[in-house]
């Protein structure tokens, strides 16, 4: 083999290595960019379109009666509450592609219970501290006499929140943008 043959093979080998390294870097950067985009609310309705549009709209709306808008103002994104599990995402993608999804998405597929909401990542307080923080209300919804009520019974993420107290206390003041319990039940049945 002549020197030029060896040198030509070496150049081809280096060129192939450079192309391979560049391809790996481009794929890694594209993957990282996709991962960052995947964590943004805009991803949810850019990919899934119709079933997620209304949820991203409530996130962006600023309507303080919806948890998603309140959380958006605090810098929270969808994946802070909706954990991205691969099996769930594959099932959701399959439902979307096959046009076999519920619209609107079923409301109670996601439970906001005390341990989910009252922790270091979200509302860093105990149940007693929460009860104390709402003690100035005429009907304190967080007192223990009401039993175990999930946070999501009142605080709705993507629809009007519900003043659950009005189920028993019809005279309880309903915050702006919220629904009374009877209005909620009527809307749910229609």
Question: Model-flagged regions — what are they?
Answer:
Residues 2-190:
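Short sequence/structural segments immediately N-terminal
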């Amino acid at each position: 083999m002549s020197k030029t043959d060896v040198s030509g093979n070496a150049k081809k080998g280096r060129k192939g290595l450079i192309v391979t390294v560049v391809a790996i870097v481009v794929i890694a950067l594209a993957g990282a960019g996709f991962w960052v985009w995947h964590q943004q609310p805009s991803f949810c309705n850019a990919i899934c379109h119709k079933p997620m549009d209304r949820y991203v709209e409530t996130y962006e709306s600023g309507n303080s009666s919806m948890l998603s808008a309140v959380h958006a103002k605090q810098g929270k994104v969808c994946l802070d509450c909706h954990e991205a599990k691969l099996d769930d995402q594959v099932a959701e993608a399959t439902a979307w592609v096959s046009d076999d999804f519920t619209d609107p998405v079923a409301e109670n597929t996601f439970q906001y219970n005390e341990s989910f909401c009252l922790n270091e990542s979200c509302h860093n307080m105990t149940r007693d501290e929460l009860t104390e923080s709402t003690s100035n209300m005429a009907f304190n919804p967080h007192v223990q006499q009401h039993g175990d009520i999930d946070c999501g019974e009142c605080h709705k993420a993507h629809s009007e929140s519900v003043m659950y107290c009005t189920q028993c206390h019809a005279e309880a003041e309903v915050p702006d943008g919220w629904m009374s319990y009877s209005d909620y039940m009527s809307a749910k049945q229609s």
